[in-house]
Amino acid sequence: MRIIAISYLRPFWETNPDAEQPLKSWVDEVKKANWSQPSDIKAQYRSASILKNRRVVFNIKGNDYRLVVSVAYRFQAVYVKFIGTHAEYDLIDAETVEMES
């Protein structure tokens, strides 16, 4: 899978250093993945939440951080839509959130 907007992850782990290794591991795993449907994601990440609009929520570092992505299965692309703490995640709508520029 190709990860789009991966550049948003670096500033996050620079301010949350304990998220760096878990996020880098997630990036490595996703780049090697070949997902064609939501069940492929669930097979690899049992704790991932599949939402409407091709959105998926991943727990990072246990449940300390949340990563929301949109998956374009046909194009083998994952778009980063949100990265934040669990508390920050509780304040957003994961089905519509977009990264701020």
Annotated model-derived regions:
Residues M1-D64, A72-A77, H86-S101:
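Basic, Lys/Arg-enriched alpha-helical interface segments
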